[in-house]
Amino acid sequence: MNDVKSILVNGLWKNNSALVQLLGMCPLLAVTSTATNALGLGLATTLVLTLTNASISAFRRWMPGEIRIPIYVMIIAAVVSIVQMLINAYAFGLYQSLGIFIPLIVTNCIVVGRAEAFAAKNGPLLSALDGFAIGLGATGAMFVLGSLREILGNGTLFDGADGLLGSWARVLRIEVFHTDTPFLLAMLPPGAFIGLGMMLAVKYLIDERMKRRAAKPVVVEAAAEKAS
């Protein structure tokens, strides 16, 4: 149970691939112009991470150490191809929006990094959980950044959700405020960098506050021991 909790906390917060490791910056900055695109690529990446981690862990005993990286890439490429075909079949609008960034998951440092750092050393179940947690953490960061940029840029949220979830999802579209002229800075790459910087700053402040709260009982206990 402790292992499961540690994996989830590390993947979602402490070792977040986007906000701590700063991996996968290319899709993170390029695709997060809307919340829907960010959520779509994030979920695809999570699925790839979960399946590749489990597969690599299951076959790790039969992988020669000298050629393990090419084998990882072949497994990742096979899983990405399957995910790409599924998105093409069931979410064609999203497939068109994400474009080249779906096959580029193969070269994403997050996927290869978790295969080498965790899946090659642990069992399939824990490896699948690690991939799921890391992917969910990256998806959360993408979604927050995509939502921030979409709201500031277009004044909407979940615009184009029907491309990901089907025609019923048109009702999810929210017009936060009306604008006749989009705020281009938020929609272009500079806005992605600024938004990511703000998210990094907020995470740093939260972590520092949590550290101070955790340190207070220790200080009080030490003071009580001195007094006695």
Curated annotation (Swiss-Prot):
InterPro entries: NqrDE/RnfAE (IPR003667), RnfE (IPR010968)
Main localization of the protein described in the UniProt heading: membrane
Binding partners and assembly: The complex is composed of six subunits: RnfA, RnfB, RnfC, RnfD, RnfE and RnfG.
EC number from the UniProt entry: 7.-.-.-
Transmembrane segments: 18-38, 69-89, 92-112, 125-145, 182-202
UniProt organism field: Cronobacter sakazakii (strain ATCC BAA-894)
PANTHER family hit by this protein: ELECTRON TRANSPORT COMPLEX PROTEIN RNFE (PTHR30586), ION-TRANSLOCATING OXIDOREDUCTASE COMPLEX SUBUNIT E (PTHR30586:SF0)
The protein's name in its UniProt record: Ion-translocating oxidoreductase complex subunit E
Domain of life: Bacteria
Subcellular locations according to the entry: Cell inner membrane
Keyword terms of this UniProt record: Cell inner membrane, Cell membrane, Electron transport, Membrane, Translocase, Transmembrane, Transmembrane helix, Transport
Membrane topology term: Multi-pass membrane protein
GO (cellular component) term, any one: plasma membrane
Enzyme class label: translocase
Lineage: Bacteria, Pseudomonadati, Pseudomonadota, Gammaproteobacteria, Enterobacterales
Annotated GO biological process: electron transport chain
Function according to Swiss-Prot or TrEMBL: Part of a membrane-bound complex that couples electron transfer with translocation of ions across the membrane.
Family assignment from sequence similarity: Belongs to the NqrDE/RnfAE family.
